């Protein structure tokens, strides 16, 4: 990986015609057991992602020296880059389990994107507007992947296909809702959720039963308090609902969650950036540690120029640097963010129903009024 990193940095734009030959092998190393290899692979992948928008038909003349086989391979693998850079190009994904819901077209696109991330062991942030079905889309890929993994293990007995449980972490007010939604949309034949809640003694009993369930739903505080238990398990999916909660990477909660081991990591949030650009770094540090560099490197490269450009007293040079930093950050994170707002999908949404309910004031309310 060190040699490849040197090649990428040394060739710079000269490596663009060969991007497709490097991206998938680098992806494979991003899940390496060696942490140093993982970090170096993530660093290389980040460098390649920044160059991906340049890989288009306009540079096909660079393919001249390549053999016919390599040109054919490059043409076929460009489809991967198209899917990575534009979620709408993701191949249509057929769910392997029945879902008790009719997916709207934008929800199917969301599932297609989640399946693409799954196929290449990538991780991402689904940040649709509230009410567009982030939970349903997540349940679809969760149930389908669990079923496929189970079937593959039955057929091959491969160690890397052995069924693993998944974990959903969400605010305490949503844990019951998640269990309800899973049971509503998916048969217990495919997902058996465990509502992991209660006082310490009750949770200790639930830990003994956890192996009988393939999905655990718990709140952020409980996962933080019981991290010694959760960190010992290898999860298939780890989904953070309202994941912007970990926007401050220095909190005990964020540090605890980053100890979790999972094949696939997904964040659900309607607001990936709440206060400052640095919020995004913490989210990606959970998804793909090293992808946006260290916190200090991120601040130096992105946060500081962007903040300085927004100052009313900033110079034209600082404003230009801020725009360039924003564009660079956008290119780097765009493949791993999917956001649709209600205005984008109005044609898919049912008509709004408005009902008025009249309530009698209580005696106390009457006096106050």
Model regions and ranges:
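Core helices of alpha-solenoid repeat scaffolds
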Residues: 12-24
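Alpha-solenoid HEAT/Armadillo-like helical repeat scaffolds in large eukaryotic proteins
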Residues: 25-29
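Short inter-helical turns and helix N-cap capping residues of alpha-solenoid HEAT/ARM repeat scaffolds
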Residues: 33-34
């Amino acid at each position: 990986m060190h040699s490849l990193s040197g090649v990428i940095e040394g060739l710079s734009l000269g490596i663009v015609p060969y991007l497709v030959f490097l991206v998938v092998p680098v992806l494979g190393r991003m899940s390496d057991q060696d942490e140093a290899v993982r970090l170096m692979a993530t660093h290389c992948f980040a460098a390649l992602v920044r160059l991906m928008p340049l890989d288009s038909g306009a540079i096909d003349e660079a393919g001249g020296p390549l053999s016919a086989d390599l040109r054919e391979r490059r043409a076929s693998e460009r489809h991967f880059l198209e899917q990575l850079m534009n979620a709408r190009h993701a191949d249509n994904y057929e769910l392997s389990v029945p879902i008790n819901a009719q997916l709207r077209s934008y929800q199917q696109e969301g599932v297609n994107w989640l399946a693409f991330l799954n196929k290449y062991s990538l991780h991402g942030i689904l940040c649709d507007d509230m009410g567009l079905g982030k939970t349903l889309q997540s349940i679809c890929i969760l149930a389908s992947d669990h079923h496929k993994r189970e079937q593959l293990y039955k057929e091959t007995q491969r160690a890397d296909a052995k069924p693993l449980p998944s974990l959903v972490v969400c605010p305490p007010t949503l844990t019951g809702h998640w269990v309800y939604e899973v049971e509503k949309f998916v048969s217990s034949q495919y997902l058996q959720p465990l509502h992991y809640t209660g006082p310490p003694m009750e949770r200790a009993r639930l830990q003994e039963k956890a192996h009988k369930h393939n999905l655990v739903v718990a709140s952020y505080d409980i996962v933080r308090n019981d991290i010694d238990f959760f960190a010992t398990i290898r999860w298939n999916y780890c989904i953070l609902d309202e994941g912007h909660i970990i926007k401050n990477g220095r909190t005990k909660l964020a540090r605890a969650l980053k100890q979790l081991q999972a094949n696939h990591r997904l964040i659900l949030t309607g607001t990936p950036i709440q206060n400052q650009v640095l919020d995004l770094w913490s989210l990606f540090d959970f998804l793909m540690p090293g992808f946006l560099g260290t916190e200090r490197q991120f601040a130096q490269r992105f946060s500081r120029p962007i903040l300085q450009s927004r100052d009313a007293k900033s110079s034209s040079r600082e404003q230009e640097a801020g725009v360039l930093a924003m564009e660079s950050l956008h290119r780097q994170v765009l493949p791993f963010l999917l956001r649709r707002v209600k205005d984008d999908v109005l044609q898919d949404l049912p008509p709004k129903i408005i009902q008025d309910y009249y309530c009698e004031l209580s005696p106390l309310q009457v006096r106050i009024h």
